[in-house]
Amino acid sequence: MTIEDRGDAHVITHSLAKHTLSRLRDTTTEQVSFRKGLVKLGRISGYEIIDGAMETEFTAFETPLTETTGERVTGLDDVVIINVLRAATPFVEGLLKAFPRAKQGVISAGRDEDAGMDADGEFPITVDYVKLPDISEGDTVIVADPMLATGSTMCTVLDHVTDEMPAAGVEDLFVLSAVSAPDGLLRVGDQFPDADLLTVAIDDTLTDDGYIVPGLGDAGDRAFRTT
């Protein structure tokens, strides 16, 4: 398992994940390569979740030559992936390569840039659309958004997700990002202590406008070639 415990979060240290993130940060990486990079990062992250959080069991079966036993991952059919529109769309596409039978939910949420960040380092968040599947106690829930900056958007999204969860909770609740800022990790961790925060990188600087530095820019704009 290539995940490092960083106190407030678990950092994916897989070499290919770090390589892919470096490509995403690079301004010379054009739209198609950027989008494909997010897909790849989602798939790697999915495999890391399987390796680090899911159990296996031995099962009997037949090969073309004989009877034998082998390991199979349990819980692959009990995964719920929440796509925070729109930047997470290619990220989630990669997750679905690891969890092809996952149920999917979408939440369209974004911060009010015109209102700006308040004295507590939070943005007002607008939620335009919510569509979530049924969530059961045995489910592994993955809420995916490439950038976790102030944590304002993620906390709002998690409010909606946890409202749909059973009272007893779920098997695992992951908050998955490509790049995170310490302020956002602390905010999400404080408000949702049962969530496992999983990221590929933690960048130290958050600007007064709420952008992560060095970061990778606006993931949605770079993936969809919009400004």
Curated annotation (Swiss-Prot):
Q: What is its EC number?
A: 2.4.2.9
The record's keywords, sorted A to Z, are: Allosteric enzyme, Glycosyltransferase, GTP-binding, Magnesium, Nucleotide-binding, Transferase
Q: Which annotated residues bind GTP? A: K36, G37, L38, V39, K40
Identify the species of origin.
Halobacterium salinarum (strain ATCC 700922 / JCM 11081 / NRC-1) (Halobacterium halobium)
* Role, per record: Catalyzes the conversion of uracil and 5-phospho-alpha-D-ribose 1-diphosphate (PRPP) to UMP and diphosphate.
Q: Which cofactor does it need?
A: Mg(2+)
| GO molecular function terms listed in the Swiss-Prot or TrEMBL record | GTP binding; magnesium ion binding; uracil phosphoribosyltransferase activity
Q: Which residues make up the binding site for 5-phospho-alpha-D-ribose 1-diphosphate?
A: R86, R111, D145, P146, M147, L148, A149, T150, G151, S152, T153, D218
Q: Which InterPro entries match?
A: PRibTrfase_dom, PRTase-like, Upp_A, Ura_phspho_trans
Q: Can you list the GO cellular component terms from the UniProt entry?
A: cytoplasm
Using the UniProt record, name the top-level EC class of this enzyme in a single word: transferase
Q: Which biological pathway?
A: Pyrimidine metabolism; UMP biosynthesis via salvage pathway; UMP from uracil: step 1/1
**SUPFAM superfamilies xrefs:** PRTase-like (SSF53271)
Biological-process GO terms, alphabetical: UMP salvage; uracil salvage
Q: Does the keyword Nucleotide-binding apply?
A: yes
Give the residue spans that cross the bilayer.
Answer: none
Q: What is this protein called?
A: Uracil phosphoribosyltransferase
Q: What is the lineage of its organism?
A: Archaea, Methanobacteriati, Methanobacteriota, Stenosarchaea group, Halobacteria
Sequence positions that bind uracil: I212, G217, D218, A219
NCBIfam families from the entry? PRK00129.1, upp
